[in-house]
């Protein structure tokens, strides 16, 4: 999809020359006098347990562009074949992102700063997939982007050049798909009860206690927490909070009118102030602002 939006119409909701990713499944671009394309591609059925989607993001940002993104509970493998860009989080100085990298879980909003040609292709991976591919301890990848050259068995330069030189979207996605397929034996052999725990939390939209997850899988809480840190990178409690935030964001984004008390009950918050506090921990606006922004954006997206 291509978005062409004027920030003049959105000035009450957002500063110019910025984009915000709205939850795990919704990215909108609102930049003055610019055209951006962000397109998702679904994996083949064999890969759906391990891959959420593929994506291609292309465009131009001659005057500079900031992208803010909240946590979404996924990992990613990314190939940047455009101009270099930087990333920052928690008021840390921006750092240049590797041209090919793996990222783990993010626990707070991060900001990308781009200028020039934007050309990025990537894979959004399910929470356990990186560990199942490489055996990595995922707690070491939290809030970070590790160059693919650190991971064994990957012909990084060949892959990066192949993605860059392939002109068709379908060709780029095929390269990424074949890469994951080549790791399927390793991925499947490393599936464990923690993969089941992640799936159960996802099914519950994060509205589940750690004790209930452990009881459901007939394992101890201590074992669940220890192995979850290894395979996912964060605690099961924190992961559930991220999933609840994602489900909540999706609910707010797609309702014309909101019954806040109903949402408080549905997502197991103590009260509305608890909901707002939790939402703002993962996003940089409150739920009402988020709802207004999404309604405004849907009026202008073509």
Residue ranges of predicted features:
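Conserved structured core elements
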Residues: 218, 239-242, 273
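A secondary-structure capping/hinge motif
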Residues: 230-234, 279-288
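Long, low-complexity intrinsically disordered regions
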Residues: 211, 225-230, 234-240
């Amino acid at each position: 999809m291509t978005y062409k939006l004027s920030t003049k119409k959105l000035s009450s909701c957002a500063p110019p020359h910025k984009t915000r990713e709205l939850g795990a499944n919704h990215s909108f671009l609102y930049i003055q006098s610019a055209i951006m394309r962000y397109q998702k591609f679904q994996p083949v059925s064999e890969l759906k347990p391990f891959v959420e989607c593929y994506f291609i993001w292309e465009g131009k940002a001659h005057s500079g562009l900031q992208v803010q993104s909240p946590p979404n509970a996924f990992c990613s493998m990314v190939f940047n074949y455009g101009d270099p860009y930087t990333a920052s989080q928690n008021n840390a100085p921006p750092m240049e992102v590797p041209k090919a990298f793996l990222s783990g879980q993010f626990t707070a909003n991060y900001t990308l700063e781009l200028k020039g040609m934007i050309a990025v292709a990537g894979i959004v991976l399910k929470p356990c997939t990186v560990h199942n591919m490489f055996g990595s301890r995922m707690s070491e990848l939290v809030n970070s982007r590790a160059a693919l050259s650190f991971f064994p068995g990957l012909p990084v330069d060949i892959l990066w050049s192949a993605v860059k030189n392939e002109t068709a979207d379908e060709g780029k996605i095929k390269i990424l798909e074949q890469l994951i397929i080549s790791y399927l034996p390793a991925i499947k052999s490393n599936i464990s009860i923690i993969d089941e725990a992640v799936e159960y939390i996802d099914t519950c939209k994060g509205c589940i206690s750690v004790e209930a997850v452990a009881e459901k899988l007939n394992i101890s809480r201590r074992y669940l927490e220890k192995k979850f840190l290894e395979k996912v990178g964060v605690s099961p409690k924190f992961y559930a909070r991220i999933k609840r935030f994602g489900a909540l964001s999706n609910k707010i984004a797609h309702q014309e009118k909101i019954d806040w008390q109903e949402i408080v009950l549905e997502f197991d918050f103590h009260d509305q102030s608890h909901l707002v506090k939790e939402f703002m921990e993962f996003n940089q606006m409150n739920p009402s602002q988020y709802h207004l922004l999404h309604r405004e954006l849907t009026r202008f997206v073509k």
